[in-house]
Amino acid sequence: MFELAVNFPIHNEEKSIIGVLNEWIFELDKLKIDYCLVISEDGSNDKTKSVLSRFMLNNKRVIDNMVEEKRGYTGATISGIKVADAKYILCVDSDGQCDPSDFVKFWNKRFEISDSVMIGNRKNRKDTNLRLLCSKFFGIFHYLMFPNKIKDPSCPYVLFEKKLIKNIDIYLNYVDEAFWWLFVAACVKKKIKIYQMDINHRERFIGMTQVYKLHKFPIIFIKNFLGLIKLKLAN
């Protein structure tokens, strides 16, 4: 068993993913952690798979969690958590916006988060205005259904002990896109304490953050809203 598994849900990141992974390797090696990187590739239709396959040939700390079909962000994230053979799980996005240099702050607090979760709070968030507006709008409904003091419930920079997931895993597939909103809501529902840590939020390494087309937002919002209602009504 590894001490730490870093789970990367990856989709269409052929030009940037190796730089992202190498940045994390550099920081984790400095901390002398027994770690692995879980490559939860999610049915990319560019050259991401072949780029990652070459990378894995030269790195024994990489866990291959690649599939042909697209599982979606939620499916890829949950799958990566399940295959990770480690005491601690860190989940981060794979676009370079999560700064590896922030991780030492999380790791130094790991003994304080037994049976709890530590989530990042993105300072000066580098996302589009539309994405920020959607987060604020959905955040209102999230808070009304699951009151909490978390400043950034959708932040994809989350550390927890793997054993904790058994308390909430039955709820985690209730939404397709808004995984971390649901994760935080499930923790609130099960009275799992959540700690927050300010983190740096960077521009993407390459390309633009995926934002759904405007005409798709109503159905996406409704689906995720219904997922939160389902969680609210669940035992």
Task: Provide a role label for each language-model segment.
Residues E3-A5, C36, L182:
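Cell-envelope/extracellular polymer assembly enzymes that use nucleotide-activated donors
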Residues Y35, K49-V83:
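Conserved donor nucleotide-binding strand/loop of the catalytic core
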Residues E41-S50, G96:
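A conserved acidic beta->alpha catalytic loop
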Residues E68-V83, Y88-C91, P100-E177, R204-F225:
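Acceptor/aglycone-binding surface of glycosyltransferases and processive sugar-polymer synthases
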